[in-house]
Amino acid sequence: MTSSLVGSEMCIRDRGAHHKTIPLRRMPGLFYKEMCEAGVLGFIQSASVPLRALYDRPLVNDKNTTFDNLPEVCDIKLDEHQYAVIEQMAKERREFWLEFDIRNHFKLGPVKYHNVVASIKGTKYPDEYVIISGHLDAFDVATGGIDCGTGIGPMMEAARLIALSGAKPKRTILFIAFAGEEFGLLGAKAYARTHQNELGKIANLFNRDGGPTPPIGISVPQAMYDDFVEICKPVKNINPDFPFEVKVAKPRKRPTSTGGTDASVFAVEGVPTYGFTTDDIKGYNFSYGEIWHTERDLYTKNIPEYQEHTAVVTAIVALGVANLDKQLSREGMYKE
């Protein structure tokens, strides 16, 4: 195998073959079919660090993509620093070999997916709900330890803590691990669609999908403020290292389309989705941008004491909402 520099890209060719190289842009396009027919083995493109598993999203989301016209040639995004070394060698007209172990597998769908739902049934208002959620899938080449292990982990621990305490909440508490979040909020949309009659009875959905940093507060409408101040009083006594403040949130514009998290599916339906404000309070120098959808998204990037504190706060606040004598008011959530 040999490689030829093609503009700012490289084209992998059979050793000994003599094909004219064609300049490429970000994605192979110009004469792509002809190059494949001519025997090109693949393409190498420089990619900024960290490498994000987002390059195939245009292909995945293209409605014209079918099982019959999937790519047959590998398109390799290489660490820009490694690429620079190879690029310099090519400019020097040095011969070198590149070896890649490429294992891509396509399976004809549809692919089944499942939400995982657990519940602690309410004793007085079993048909009213508090939801704690995260998403089960990951969209990267790592393990999803952060996105969304930092949501699923505290959710499961909060469930364990509430169950272990023997608490009997007045409202039903649901713990939901949504499937298919990274491919269009599929699990959340399916749940909302099949539970339309329950959406008006959801007091709040606490969705965690943004890294391991711990809760330091929550902002809610004026109509919910007094309830949350009372609910959150025990939170300040958990650990003096972690402050917590309840603030008043200004009315917001009601969303008309979903966003980047499962919570947005419920927000469109008018369900309260007020989540915790978080911060790297102890200065671990965590950067979500450095791991989001990259090979760095590992459980080793997690911060145990942050996760533990998050689980306790989540359990206390969710249980507090579930035990209110009245349903949380939705007054003042949205601008008139």
Where do the PLM segments sit?
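His/Asp/Glu-rich mid-to-C-terminal helical/loop segments that flank catalytic regions of hydrolases
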Residues: 68, 160, 283-336
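Short, conserved micro-motifs enriched in small and acidic residues
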Residues: 2, 26, 142-153, 181-182, ...
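Second-shell loop/turn segments in exported
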Residues: 15-26, 30-32, 71-76, 104-107, ...
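Single conserved hydrophobic/aromatic residue that forms the stacking wall/gate
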Residues: 1-7, 11-14
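Soluble metallo-hydrolase cores and metallopeptidase-like ectodomains found primarily
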Residues: 61-145, 157-170
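Structural recognition of the beta-strand scaffold that forms the well-ordered cores
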Residues: 41-46, 75-77, 117-119, 129-133, ...
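Metal-dependent peptidase/peptidase-like ectodomains
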Residues: 73-75, 125, 140, 178-285
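Non-catalytic positions within long, well-ordered alpha-helices that form the structural scaffold/packing
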Residues: 32-39, 267
